[in-house]
Amino acid sequence: MADAFRNQLNDPKFKEIPFEDRFAMLVDIEYSNRKNNRLKRLIRNAGFDQPEANIMDINYTSGRKLNKNLISRLATCEYISEHRNLFITGATGCGKTYMACAFGMEACKRYFTTKYIRLPDLLIDLEIARSEGSYRKVLAKYANPLVLILDEWLLLKPTEIEQKDIFELLHRRRKKSSTIFCSQYGFEEWYDQLGGDDSPLADAIIDRIAHDSYRINITSIDAEHDISMREVYGLDKMLRE
């Protein structure tokens, strides 16, 4: 606000404007600056893998069977207020991470706290925290954001201890926040990836995330000739060289 006030003092045209109007301008500028700074912090703290992701740039014509109406509805972020989850599934390179980050950016624009993390990295964080005595603090770091993006969900089958970590995290988030799951496996395969009948927690974990969830499965009409979304969005360094 101080900079804006000095600009007014140094600009002769502002001398013709009543003080009340000039003060209102300063308030508007300060309000806009604070909103912009808050948005920048939210995006920075989210740690997006693809911070350039934009919901308007999602490709609907590259052989993906995407429901544009559903994606547009999810972009309004009403699912966050409803504490509903989102499952994004599909093969490697189909655009799951890009889409999830685009939804995350929309959440930030509406000032919802958001966090992106790969599930393998999250589990490592919790393992280290357990050994250092900071488990609850680190668990809260991922339990508290209103939107949590879990990339590479169940890429590897979790150990028994990791299953307990996943259960604790999702139990804390249940009916309080929204989680976006990105997985190469279809939802029907998650139970087996969690240990199936051999795991006492598999049912409990699925129960805490499946209710009223939205689901987007990115498929290929012609897998043999379809190109990777990393190529479409120019995200693959090798493809840019």
Annotated model-derived regions:
Residues 1, 44-66:
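Dynamic helix-loop-helix/coil hinge segments at AAA+ ATPase domain boundaries and subdomain interfaces
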Residues 2-50:
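Interdomain "pre-motor" coupling segment immediately N-terminal to P-loop NTPase/helicase cores
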Residues 75-83:
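Phosphate-binding P-loop
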Residues 83-99:
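Walker A/P-loop nucleotide-binding motif
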Residues 84, 111-113, 144-147, 175-181:
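Loop/turn-to-beta-strand initiation segments
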Residues 104-117:
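Post-Walker A helix-loop "phosphate-sensing" segment adjacent to the P-loop in P-loop NTPases
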